[in-house]
Design a protein with these regions (language model features):
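Extended, histidine- and acidic-residue-enriched regions that form the cofactor-binding/catalytic faces
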Residues: 1-108, 114-252
């Protein structure tokens, strides 16, 4: 069993780990099954989400869950191998998972998203919060930006859109055997993607790559994951607090 993807916990492991925290917190990796060019696997987003969860689970007493491996990848439909579910289905899967966790005594859930097209996850968390539930979506754009800076990632988040420096780096660190030769010459930049939702990815790239995978390295991948694990600490504190603290700036 590959425990980097499917946790090998027993029920007693979960019970003991939960006793070390004020509240039990589960982390759910959500990815996709979509093209990532000729050099990265269809499961890249799921592998990235699971790598983040593994790093988090090594640092915090959380309950790691098996991944949701198919997401909302409709913009990649022109490439063979891509599979999608509807946003309604993904919404239901996450909400049902949270409901089931609460019945077994785990009352907080962090959704760790590995695919930018899973827009509905933000709505799931908004609605759960409005119902008084404890849920978070991770990583935020700010967390990725901090990780980029710490790891020395050259490409901006705008340019590094798909199968680029960040994803290649994380896979070179976590699953180097899955990165095929040729990524070093696969760079393709298309920063102006304003009609992406209307036209799909194929309007902007023939290869499926938008970014600079040639700049990826295992060392950058290691630092990206370490930074994200550090950023997770604030989310863990919020979800395990007796009362969810208010966040905000000063009054002007």
């Amino acid at each position: 069993m590959d425990v980097s993807l499917v946790p090998a916990d027993t029920t007693e492991d979960v019970r003991a780990r939960g006793a070390r925290a004020p509240r039990r917190v589960a982390v759910l990796p959500v990815g996709s099954y979509e093209q990532h060019g000729p050099y990265l696997p269809l499961a890249t987003d799921t592998l990235v989400a699971c790598a983040i969860v593994s790093e988090i689970a090594a640092a915090y007493p959380v309950h790691p869950l098996p991944p949701v491996t198919i997401g909302c990848s409709h913009e990649h439909a022109d490439w063979p191998g891509t599979v999608s579910i509807s946003s309604t289905t993904l919404h239901a899967v996450v909400r049902d998972t949270a409901d089931s966790l609460r019945r077994s005594g785990v009352d907080a859930l962090v959704v760790v998203n590995g695919h930018g097209g899973n827009y509905v996850l933000g709505n799931v968390v908004q609605e759960a919060t409005a119902r008084g539930e404890r849920m978070a979506l991770f990583p935020a754009a700010e967390d990725w930006e901090e990780a980029r800076e710490r790891a020395g990632v050259t490409t901006s988040l705008l340019t590094d859109m798909h199968a680029g420096e960040i994803e290649t780096s994380i896979l070179l660190h976590a699953h180097p055997e899955l990165v095929r030769p040729g990524y070093e010459a696969a760079d393709f930049v298309a920063d102006d993607r304003r009609h992406l939702l209307s036209l799909g990815m194929s309007a902007y790239t023939d290869s499926g790559v938008i970014g600079r995978p040639s700049l990826g390295s295992a060392e950058k991948g290691k630092e990206l994951l370490a930074s994200l694990a550090d950023s997770f600490g604030a989310y863990f504190s919020v979800l395990t607090a007796a009362d969810v603290p208010r966040q905000g700036g000063e009054r002007g």
